[in-house]
Every structure is written in structure tokens, then in C-alpha cells.
Amino acid sequence: MAMTAEVKDELSRLVVNSVSARRAEVASLLRFAGGLHIVSGRVVVEAEVDLGIIARRLRKDIYDLYGYNAVVHVLSASGIRKSTRYVVRVAKDGEALARQTGLLDLRGRPVRGLPAQVVGGSVGDAEAAWRGAFLAHGSLTEPGRSSALEVSCPGPEAALALVGAARRLGVSAKAREVRGSDRVVVRDGEAIGALLTRMGAQDTRLTWEERRMRREVRATANRLANFDDANLRRSARAAVAAAARVERALQILGDTVPDHLAAAGNLRVAHRQASLEELGRLADPPMTKDAVAGRIRRLLSMADRKAKQDGIPDTESAVTPDLLEDA
């Protein structure tokens, strides 16, 4: 099951005891999923949702809280409609429901944001407002670089009201207009987790957090692997360059090279990929890596001085781009 469906399924099964919170959820769900229509001179309230369990929850709450009967119509997937949709409709008592839920103000005008009783309600009402909005038009993407919890809004006023509700819950949300559509987006991973818990989707939050942690562990492992690969490549190139310089140094000095420096140089040439510590163990008698490094350093310095005196290419000339490319 996709993350969005998991959240909606869990929220639809959540038991809410507070009447005020249940009313806030219904008002928000109707505001974000529906609209008011005039049919034969009467106000009809409709809400279109994507899961049958959401439609049944809304129908039950409308009856329990307001005493009105709602009818659920099933719109099967066909044509441009990719999935089955469910329309909850209150026709006979539509105007009364619209007034009681705050979709119409005292003068009978449609409310553009969220109802005043929801905006000025308790923290529990703010949580319920988010729950209703998410059930109506929410989405949650998988954890990742572009993860987000998002709600499509019927207008900028509703979006700003939802941002304000999130602020009351200690969550930073942003209202944005994308391709002419108003949306409220939460991108921070910690904020997404906190909001899921606030809405009542704790189980889904745990699943989401687990996937998020697994992804972060994989990303960290990949970064470390890339880092290790880069280090290995640098080490290999450095070893090849050092061996090439030592080889050139032995050519420049010829028979004049001191035996102990020649021994260290020949070890470097013979074991191009070995570390200084490994070269020290291969020496006879064994020596420390610092001793090996010191002898090779003196060998190169001596050869470069002689090359300068004789006017010939020094040890650096042996390190060509082609040589490093092949390393």
C-alpha cells in the first residue's frame, strides 16, 4: 500500500471522542474535498474522496453530529478518471449542514477559508482540521531527497488557514501555488513525522521513519563507499607516481647511489602498490615506514640535484598524465 493510502486508511479508523474535534474534521473535510452547489434552488453539499472508508466515516459523522442523512455515490474508474471515487452528498438538508459546519456564514455567503470555529478552536481542533484536509486531498511521498507531505487546497484562504493550524501544532508548513493550484507543503522530515502523529497516523509514522532511516543509512554507506573508492584511487596514483620517480632517480644516479638508498628505491619499484609500512616489513633488515619514507625522500632529492647540475630531466618528468590515467 502506498504511503498516502496507508495514512488515509489509518486516519479513517481513528476513534475521536471529542465532539469539537469531530466537528472540526467534518468541516475541514467538506471544505477541502467538496463544494456547495445550487440544485433546483436548494443548497447541496458534496465531498469527493478517493477511499470508501473515508466516505463511510464522513457519512457516519454527519449523521452522528448533525442528524442529517448523507448519500454515498460511487464513481467507477473510466476515461480520464483513473481510479474509483466516492461522492458524499447531502441534498435535502444541505443548507442547514453548510451553516452548521461553517461552510456558509451568518449571511449565507460561502466561507473561503476554514470556518471561524475551527480557526479559533483548540489544539485538538487544529489537529482535526489537518486530519480532515489530508483525508480530502492529502498526499505523502516516500522518504527521500524530495519527500513531502502535501495538501491540495480549494483556494489561497484555505491554504493560509491550514498553514496557521500547522503553526499552532509547532509544525512549519508553506503555502504555494503550483500550476494554478494552491497547496500546503511540509518538507522537513522531522516536521512530517510530528504532523503524522498529530493527525493520528502514528503507525504510519513509524513505518515512514523506518524507511527514512534505511534510506539515510544506504545514502551514508554509498557516500562512504565513494569516499573509500576515491581514497583508493588517490593512493594508487600516488604509489604509481612515487615508483616512477624512484625509477628515474635510480637511472640518474646510476652507480653513485648509496646502497641503503638503492635498497629502499628498489623495494618501491618492485612493489608499486605496497604501503610504506608493507615496504618496511619487506626490507632486510625490516625498518619502520618513516625510515623507508626518509630514504626514498633522500634518494629523490639527491637525484633531482644531480639532474639540475647535469641539465637533464629530473624525477618529476617521469610522472606523465598518461601514467596517472592508467593508474
From Swiss-Prot:
Which GO biological process entries does UniProt record here? cell division; regulation of sporulation
Q: Which Pfam families match?
A: HTH_WhiA (PF02650), LAGLIDADG_WhiA (PF14527), WhiA_N (PF10298)
Provide this UniProt record's keywords sorted from A to Z.
Answer: Cell cycle, Cell division, DNA-binding
Which residue numbers delimit the DNA-binding region?
A: 277-310
Question: What InterPro entries has UniProt attached to this entry?
Answer: Homing_endonucl (IPR027434), Sporu_reg_WhiA_N_dom (IPR018478), Sporulation_regulator_WhiA (IPR003802), Sporulation_regulator_WhiA_C (IPR023054), WhiA_LAGLIDADG_dom (IPR039518)
What terms describe the molecular function in GO for this protein? Answer: DNA binding
Locate the region Disordered: 304-327
The family line of this record is:
Belongs to the WhiA family.
Function as written in the Swiss-Prot or TrEMBL entry: Involved in cell division and chromosome segregation.
**Name this protein carries in UniProt:** Probable cell division protein WhiA
Recite the lineage of the species.
Bacteria, Bacillati, Actinomycetota, Actinomycetes, Mycobacteriales
* Gene encoding the protein: whiA
